[in-house]
C-alpha cells in the first residue's frame, strides 16, 4: 500500500469514527457499536504505524515497500 492510499484509508476511518460518535452524541453506544468503534481505532493505529514505518524507511534510504502492517496488540501498546 502506498502512502497516499494509507492516508486515504486514515481519512475514511476518521470519518467513520466521527460519524459513529456524532450519531450518538449524549447517548451511550451499544455493545456492537463500542466494538465497531474499537475496531476502527485499532485499524487507525495500524495505518498510522504503517505510514510512520514507510516514512522512516524512506528517510533512512531503505525501501518503504518493505514495511508491514504490525499486529493490533503490538501497535495498541505504543505511546503516542
Residue spans for each PLM region:
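Extended, charge-rich alpha-helical interface modules
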Residues: 1-80
